[in-house]
Amino acid sequence: MTMKQFEIAAIPGDGVGKEVVAAAEKVLHTAAEVHGGLSFSFTAFPWSCDYYLEHGKMMPEDGIHTLTQFEAVFLGAVGNPKLVPDHISLWGLLLKIRRELELSINMRPAKQMAGITSPLLHPNDFDFVVIRENSEGEYSEVGGRIHRGDDEIAIQNAVFTRKATERVMRFAFELAKKRRSHVTSATKSNGIYHAMPFWDEVFQQTAADYSGIETSSQHIDALAAFFVTRPETFDVIVASNLFGDILTDISSSLMGSIGIAPSANINPSGKYPSMFEPVHGSAPDIAGQGLANPIGQIWTAKLMLDHFGEEELGAKILDVMEQVTADGIKTRDIGGQSTTAEVTDEICSRLRKL
């Protein structure tokens, strides 16, 4: 068997990012041992708020070029407002990477994890993925402000291109082929006059190329409500930048803790490496205490394996994670008493027994 080695740029970042990235790397190395035919090489970069205080920037001038030499970027968490204002840390590192590596698609799975209590009374074993357009839409910089006082006006333009809209929809349909063959479109064409009817048209045209996939369209207000009342009915949801942002925050909450929510930022062309990061922040208040939940970062590592074409190995990691949480080996944020290291070590131990 030819040994495959994946070269990964690791950016632990701030706060608990350092702890959870180390935990996920340990799980990946263990998974590689179990697999026997692949390995992971991590190159760590110290880009963080501490780096900013020393160098006056969140990353060096050639930082993006450096990242292009790797097959993926594995990021922990960014931000510490006591050291650096959030807008500087966010735009100087995380958003800079997303934009310059053309990470136009954001993917966030959500499922009812065994042993973790959802805030829903009857969660009914939901398992879905939100695919969010990550490069344009409502979060454009087109617009402006004029006048002051009673005549003051702020104009914010949303930008929807056919290229980006069709790209995110095709990604969603291709993913649905590997899952339960259903795609839901998040729209608001009954209230947004131009952009959402365009979105609906592109969705219908794209769906015509995927005869085996069932489709539905839901207005964002109703869809947000359905996430709460019947999340088990969804498979793949495709959404614009703003709508996807809203839906993914709801989906993280449904799982019981933002600490277990994973995320992937994908360059669908493969021109540049994709970036994988958990949804949670840097949580500086608990950093260094062994309280951080490693599940979000480890699940994010599973998404990276899927991206590398190692879906079977990724599925094993997810299965073992659920076995561990089902047996009550959990951090405090999800009702347990275990430390970061104890959860990580238990996952590794069970992987070795496969």
Curated annotation (Swiss-Prot):
Gene: ycsA
Cofactor note: Binds 1 Mg(2+) or Mn(2+) ion per subunit.
Keywords on record: Lyase, Manganese, Metal-binding, NAD, Oxidoreductase
Keyword flag Methyltransferase: no
UniProt keyword Secreted present: no
PANTHER family: D-MALATE DEHYDROGENASE [DECARBOXYLATING] (PTHR43275:SF1)
Entry's EC annotation: 1.1.1.93, 4.1.1.73, 1.1.1.83
Required co-factors: Mg(2+); Mn(2+); K(+)
Organism: Bacillus subtilis (strain 168)
Family to which this protein belongs: Belongs to the isocitrate and isopropylmalate dehydrogenases family.
GO molecular function: D-malate dehydrogenase (decarboxylating) (NAD+) activity; magnesium ion binding; NAD binding; tartrate decarboxylase activity; tartrate dehydrogenase activity
The protein's name in its UniProt record: Probable tartrate dehydrogenase/decarboxylase
Annotated binding of Mn(2+), by residue: 221, 245, 249
Higher taxonomy: Bacteria, Bacillati, Bacillota, Bacilli, Bacillales
Coiled coil: none
Role of this protein: Has multiple catalytic activities. Apart from catalyzing the oxidation of (+)-tartrate to oxaloglycolate, also converts meso-tartrate to D-glycerate and catalyzes the oxidative decarboxylation of D-malate to pyruvate.
Pfam families, per database record: Iso_dh
Catalytic activity reported: tartrate + NAD(+) = 2-hydroxy-3-oxosuccinate + NADH + H(+); (2R,3S)-tartrate + NAD(+) = 2-hydroxy-3-oxosuccinate + NADH + H(+); (2R,3R)-tartrate + NAD(+) = 2-hydroxy-3-oxosuccinate + NADH + H(+); (2R,3R)-tartrate + H(+) = (R)-glycerate + CO2
